[in-house]
Regions:
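...captures the hydrophobic TM-helix bundle architecture rather than a specific catalytic motif
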Residues: 1-195
Length: 195
C-alpha cells in the first residue's frame, strides 16, 4: 500500500509523458490526477488509523553496493512519514485538480500543441520526488529525492519555455539548487567519513 503511494505518481508521470499520444492527452491528465487523488485518500486512511500500517522500514531493492557501502532503496514508515504523506499527497491532489481546469484552455499554447500531458508528467514527477524525499530511509535516497525535486522544479518553472522570463527563472532555480546540493553532498560525505 505504501509502495503505491510512493510509486503511483511515478507511474502516472511515465504514462502521461510517454503514452499520451496513444491514450489521448485528456485521458493521460485524468489518469495522473486520479492516481494522486487516490493516493491522498489512502494516505488519510493510513494517517487516521482506519487501515493501520505498522511503523517499519520496507526494503524495495538493493540500490548501491560498492565495497563497504551497501545502500538499499527502502521506505521508512513512522508517524512523521505518515503526516508528510498526507501533506504532500493532499496538496499535490489539489494542485492537480486546479491544473486540470487551468490548463484546459491555456492561451499560451496553440490548439494543436500537446502541452497538458507534458505538464502533468512534470507535476506528477515532482510529487514522486517529494514522496521519495519525505520517506527516505538513508541519505543517498534522500539526496535522490532532493535532486528529483530540483529537476522537477526546473521543468515546471520553465514550462512556458517560449517566455524568456520563464527560462530565466528556471535557470536561477537550477543554480540555487546546485548551491544547496553542494552543501548537502559535503554533509553526506562527512557523515560517511566519520561514521
Amino acid at each position: 500500500m505504501i509502495e503505491f503511494l510512493i510509486f503511483g505518481p511515478l507511474l502516472g508521470s511515465l504514462i502521461s509523458g510517454l503514452m499520451y499520444r496513444s491514450i489521448g492527452e485528456d485521458v493521460a491528465t485524468i489518469f495522473t490526477t486520479s492516481i494522486v487523488i487516490i493516493g491522498a485518500l489512502i494516505s488519510w486512511i493510513i494517517f487516521l488509523d482506519i487501515m493501520p500500517v505498522e511503523n517499519d522500514t520496507r526494503v524495495i531493492f538493493d540500490w548501491i553496493t560498492s565495497g563497504a557501502l551497501n545502500s538499499q532503496w527502502a521506505v521508512k514508515i513512522d508517524s512523521l512519514v505518515k503526516v508528510m504523506l498526507v501533506v504532500v499527497l493532499s496538496v499535490s491532489s489539489l494542485v492537480h485538480l486546479y491544473s486540470l481546469g487551468y490548463m484546459r484552455h491555456d492561451h499560451n499554447w496553440n490548439s494543436n500543441e500537446n502541452y497538458k500531458a507534458r505538464f502533468f508528467s512534470y507535476l506528477s514527477f515532482f510529487t514522486f520526488a517529494m514522496l521519495v524525499l519525505v520517506s527516505a530511509d538513508n541519505l543517498l535516497q534522500l539526496f535522490f529525492g532532493w535532486e528529483g525535486v530540483g529537476v522537477a522544479s526546473y521543468l515546471l518553472i520553465g514550462f512556458y519555455f517560449k517566455k524568456p522570463s520563464a527560462n530565466s527563472a528556471a535557470i536561477k532555480a537550477f543554480v540555487v539548487n546546485r548551491v544547496g546540493d553542494f552543501g548537502f553532498l559535503i554533509g553526506i560525505f562527512l557523515i560517511y567519513l566519520y561514521s
